[in-house]
Amino acid sequence: AQGSIIRDLQNADMVLLGGDGKHKGNLINIYKKIQYGYKEPSIHLMSTKAAEITKIAVNCFLTTKISYANMIGQVLAQSNLYDEIETVLSSIGSDSRIGHKYMNFGFGFGGPCFPRDNRAFASYAQKVGVEHNIGTTTDNFNKAHLLFLKDYFINDNSDDLPFWFDYIAYKPGTDILTESQQYQLCLEFLDLGYKVYVSDDLLKDKCDARILFGVPDEKVYRIDL
């Protein structure tokens, strides 16, 4: 993942090796010679196409889980139970079949990988004849979730106070703005005339309001903590 690529490589849960032909079994021996991490991953050998499908299917499972957690959060918010969202999701994640990872309410998924893989899997599923696939639904919900957050935060801001973002990259620890819902929400608020405060150490050198947001500098305030 962006922001932790080396650490993730050294501590992978699994390694997918895809190959075709009678010598593909050699891939495992080759990998073991170069594997230098601190954790012994499970290694899975399969055809090239199966490995490609597996890779994007893993990310699609995560995007679906993110979207499902956000949907639960929306249901609770609409039920006047916003303060209990974290408690409910934590309770659901306590079930060992589900787990706590990605069971959080907040911004939808973004970045260069999740949206791309989600759409690729949805497109491929449709191509091979799987209709009404979850990938398409997840992608549509993720886009709609941004609008939900915008409306919710505006309705909750009756005093028209400035909005604060502690980061605007698609996730903490990177400076990547690709499909970042935080960044998109900043643009939405600025377009509506709100002031925005941004505190993002990794983006502070890039935080020129005219470049990032297309607005005068006095509309966006960079906060150094």
Question: What kind of feature is each model-predicted range?
Answer:
Residues 1-225:
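Structural/interface elements that position substrates and couple domains in central-metabolism enzymes
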